[in-house]
Amino acid sequence: MDVLLLAAIALTVGWHSRVAAVLVFVLVLSFQYRNPLVFNAGDVLLRVEAFVIALAPSGAALSLDERRRTGSFWSAQTRAPWPLRLLQIQLTVVYLATFVARMTGEKWPAGTAVSYALRLEDMVIVALPRAVLESPALMNAGTWVVLVGEVLLGICVWKPRFPPIVVALGVALHLTIMVTIAVGFFSPAMMLLYLAFLPSDVAERWMRRRAGPSTV
C-alpha cells in the first residue's frame, strides 16, 4: 500500500511518469484482487483508467519530467490524442452499458430504484426528508431522470455544441451522488472521465495564465 501511495504521488507530479503509471496500474490491480469483498464498479473503472494512463504519454505535460526537458512545468508536447479518446469512449460505454443492465432488472423499469437506494442506511450519507422518500411520484420521477439522463449525457457529450453544458450537468450529477450515497471511487472516477472532454483551447489558456509570458 505504501508503494502504491508513493507511485501515485510520483504520477501526480509527473516524476518518472511512465514507470510510476505502470506501477500504479499493477499495484491497483494487485490491491483490488486481494480485497474482493470490497470490490465494486468504481474499482473496475479506476482500473481501466489506470491502464489507459499507463499506456499514455502522461509525462508529456504538466510534469516534472517535462520540466527537466524544457525547464517549464507548464509546457506540453504535441502527442496523438488516442488516450483521451479512449477515456471519452469509456464514459459513454459506462452510461449505455449501465442503462442496458438496469432495464433487464425490475426496480429501474418500475421506477422504484432510487427509492430503494436512498433507503439503504449503511450507504446513505445525507438522508432526504421522509416525505420525499415516501412520495411515489417523486421517487418515480427521480428514477427516470437518472435513467434517461445518464443515457443522454453519454450521447450528447459528443455533440459539438453541447460539451460544456453536458460536462457541467454530468459533474453535478456525480457530485450529488457522491455526497448522498457512499459509492466508493465511482463518482470521482466518472468526473475524471469528463476531464477528457475539456476543449484543448481551454486547457492551453489555463496553462498560459499560470506559466506567464515564458510559456514554451
Show where each model-derived region lies.
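Extended, low-polarity transmembrane helix blocks
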Residues: M1-K107, P136-V216
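Solvent-exposed, well-ordered loop and adjacent helix/strand elements within mature globular domains
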Residues: R102-G142
